[in-house]
Amino acid sequence: MPTDHEEPCGPSHKSFCLNGGLCYVIPTIPSPFCRCVENYTGARCEEVFLPGSSIQTKSNLFEAFVALAVLVTLIIGAFYFLCRKGHFQRASSVQYDINLVETSSTSAHHSHEQH
């Protein structure tokens, strides 16, 4: 059903819309547009629209979202694990350095006492 600003297409655009779509023009816009009949969509009603396909698309979108959430969780977990592992290595390395310094100074102290 056309609005006040829409007019049916003239003979020059007779076959513009496909699959039974109705062609309309808006005088201020140079190109025509289509109002598609049921089960068709697209700029020129060129695509078949199956109601089940929208359900399938929603299902695929949900599956993609779940997969993305799992992937992000795994990445965060791996990052956390690596950071904690790196932190413990750094802490034990510092402890090793402190022990090495203490051992060295104790050894040096003992060697001075022996002379």
UniProtKB/Swiss-Prot annotation:
InterPro entries named in the record: EGF-like_dom
Subunit structure: Interacts with ERBB4.
Record-annotated disulphide pairs: 9-23, 17-34, 36-45
Residue ranges of the TM segments: 63-83
Cellular component, GO, one term: extracellular space
Domain notes: The cytoplasmic domain may be involved in the regulation of trafficking and proteolytic processing. Regulation of the proteolytic processing involves initial intracellular domain dimerization. ERBB receptor binding is elicited entirely by the EGF-like domain.
SMART domains assigned to the protein according to its UniProt record, in alphabetical order: EGF
Glycan-bearing residues: 39
Protein name, UniProt field: Pro-neuregulin-4, membrane-bound isoform
Gene Ontology BP annotations: ERBB4-ERBB4 signaling pathway
The protein's role, per its UniProt record: Low affinity ligand for the ERBB4 tyrosine kinase receptor. Concomitantly recruits ERBB1 and ERBB2 coreceptors, resulting in ligand-stimulated tyrosine phosphorylation and activation of the ERBB receptors. Does not bind to the ERBB1, ERBB2 and ERBB3 receptors.
Family that this chain belongs to: Belongs to the neuregulin family.
GO molecular function: growth factor activity; receptor ligand activity
Alphabetized Pfam families for the sequence: EGF (PF00008)
